[in-house]
């Protein structure tokens, strides 16, 4: 005779950690060349002046400067863009 009743198995007992996406540097902040500005899936935010885009759509600063975000419309659709204003 078994002294313990057989326990049921759980099918939902796992979870994956978050991927830490999002905006890393906000408007008005000073950045150095190479700093990551945004980690994203696809082009939610497009690269503007002095901003580069990596293979995984990560936006990064190409020069030292100050971050500015901008929204603009094209064919009745709203887009966001990030620029770096260079500092001397």
Swiss-Prot record:
It comes from the Bacteria. GO terms for biological process: translation. GO terms for molecular function: structural constituent of ribosome. InterPro entries: Ribosomal_bL27. The keyword Aminoacyl-tRNA synthetase does not apply. The keyword Aminoacyl-tRNA synthetase does not apply. Keywords: Ribonucleoprotein, Ribosomal protein. Gene3D superfamilies: 2.40.50.100. Residues 1-25 are annotated as: Disordered. GO terms for cellular component: cytosolic large ribosomal subunit. It holds the Pfam family Ribosomal_L27. HAMAP family: Ribosomal_bL27. PANTHER family: LARGE RIBOSOMAL SUBUNIT PROTEIN BL27M, RIBOSOMAL PROTEIN L27. Belongs to the bacterial ribosomal protein bL27 family. This is Large ribosomal subunit protein bL27. It comes from Lawsonia intracellularis.
């Amino acid at each position: 005779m078994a002294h313990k009743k057989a326990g049921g198995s759980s099918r939902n007992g796992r979870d994956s950690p978050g991927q830490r996406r999002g905006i890393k540097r906000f408007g008005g902040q000073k950045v150095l060349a190479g700093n990551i500005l945004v980690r994203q899936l696809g082009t939610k935010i497009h690269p503007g002046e002095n901003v580069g885009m990596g293979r995984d759509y990560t936006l990064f600063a190409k020069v030292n400067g100050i971050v500015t975000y901008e929204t603009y419309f094209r064919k009745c659709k709203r887009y966001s863009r990030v620029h770096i204003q260079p500092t001397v």
